[in-house]
Curated annotation (Swiss-Prot):
Quaternary assembly: The 4 large subunits of the cytochrome b6-f complex are cytochrome b6, subunit IV (17 kDa polypeptide, PetD), cytochrome f and the Rieske protein, while the 4 small subunits are PetG, PetL, PetM and PetN. The complex functions as a dimer.
Named cofactor requirement(s): heme
Subcellular location as annotated: Cellular thylakoid membrane
GO molecular function: electron transfer activity; heme binding; iron ion binding
Gene, per the UniProt record: petA
Upper classification of the organism: Bacteria, Bacillati, Cyanobacteriota, Cyanophyceae, Nostocales
GO terms under cellular component: plasma membrane-derived thylakoid membrane
Mode of membrane association: Single-pass membrane protein
Protein name, per record: Cytochrome f
Keywords for this protein: Electron transport, Heme, Iron, Membrane, Metal-binding, Photosynthesis, Signal, Thylakoid, Transmembrane, Transmembrane helix, Transport
Binding annotation for heme: 45, 66, 69-70
Organism: Mastigocladus laminosus
Broad class of the protein's primary localization: membrane
Cytoplasmic face of the membrane: 38-298
UniProt signal peptide: 1-37
Amino acid sequence: MRNSCKKARRTRPLKATIQALLVAIATMTFFFTSDIALPQSAAAYPFWAQQTYPETPREPTGRIVCANCHLAAKPAEVEVPQSVLPDTVFKAVVKIPYDTKLQQVAADGSKVGLNVGAVLMLPEGFKIAPEERIPEELKKEVGDVYFQPYKEGQDNVLLVGPLPGEQYQEIVFPVLSPNPTTDKNIHFGKYAIHLGANRGRGQIYPTGEKSNNNVFTASATGTITKIAKEEDEYGNVKYQVSIQTDSGKTVVDTIPAGPELIVSEGQAVKAGEALTNNPNVGGFGQDDTEIVLQDPNRVKWMIAFICLVMLAQLMLILKKKQVEKVQAAEMNF
């Protein structure tokens, strides 16, 4: 009996590890094959960061890991109240501005609109408010946006997206503040909030490979001897650029559908020189702000102190007028 219990204990962690690996492999397989087999819009997938960096989306340097795949820097902003009371619902507004007239390449090379995505790191204890706590007016601002935690049991780090950028250049998060009186791990004070937000597809896949939303360069120095156009079974067009080096060796660089070739046959190129334009019109941005979890008793005492100061000033004014009257009476006497 004891041996069976020991075996069960040993196999539980093994089963959990195998299950996690299978889920990760299935997820990555789905997204990579869907890019090839099922052409889709230019999307921003923040949960790729979740798969690659499962513990936290923020590096020790302070950089959000989405920047590893989204190489272009673009603005992003998060707005929150300066201070909030415990156990109250407030809104955090994430702004991801861009020119909606812009279009970029999808996985099949076609031009499509941009999607947006974001990761919002709230202080410990802060989380998305339950639906019954959200006011009706705030529900309208939030819309049909779905928020998910970055990690199971970590409700203060939130993922959202991909969402259509034309509709969601501003994303409203309904946030519930914690109550230190019921949670002893939470304390009143000032806390940091971190945002990472992107519009459009990344330039690098989590595997390190370039997406077709990137600049492709020559892998060797030499002369372009041939540019061959190929079409796969799905109708996606790509180019094979043959470069003959000075030693006579031929190197072939593959250019996927999307980027436009800026070279021609017979042209001399150097290693690292661009063979295509840069099709990327999106980018990633970070923003940091602070919020104060205010003690309501401190607010009450502050109001009482202000009232006391005002009362003291009033008494001084009355006393001054009284002294002036006495002095005037003595002068008349």
